[in-house]
C-alpha cells in the first residue's frame, strides 16, 4: 500500500467537495462567504491545487450543510482502491 499521496488524489477530493457545493446549489463565491474564505481558496481546493486536512474537510462540509461522514464516504469511494 503506497504511503504517499498523488496529485490526482487531491483532484478527487476537490471534485467531491465541488459536487457537494453544487448539491447545496451554491456558487464558489457563496461557499467562500459561508466559510469566511475567498473564492480563490474554494477554487484551488476544488481543482486539487490546495491540500486540505481532515478538520478542514469537516468545516467545509458543515459550511455547505453537508454531512461530513457522507462526504468522507464519497471521497473514499471516489479515491479507488488503496
What name fits each language-model region?
Residues 22, 33, 62:
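Alpha-helical residues within the helix-turn-helix
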Residues 25-47:
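Short alpha-helical DNA-recognition segment
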Residues 49-61:
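Short, basic-rich loop-to-helix N-cap that marks the start of a DNA-contacting helix
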